[in-house]
């Protein structure tokens, strides 16, 4: 029972911090993880529910590009790589790292090229 009260306190504290500043202290401690978990669903939502697309892309191309960005973010998380691509083999560190780096590089290539197009 006591742990529930303590958990409720910390959860409320994080919510107040996010309301005041837009982020909680715990978000900063693990910034890359917070970014992945926040941006991936946003990009997936945008790929399925956008109003318009940039003039240099067709609707299908823009949707595919947004999905590719979201997929790259998904595979920048080592747990997703291990569970989904490496069949749960936690000992394949080098391969996991290479997959994560490849997705990192591709994500930031797409993200930097289309940063100002991420609107709806």
Which residues are covered by each model-predicted region?
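Long, non-globular targeting/processing and low-complexity regions
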Residues: 1-120
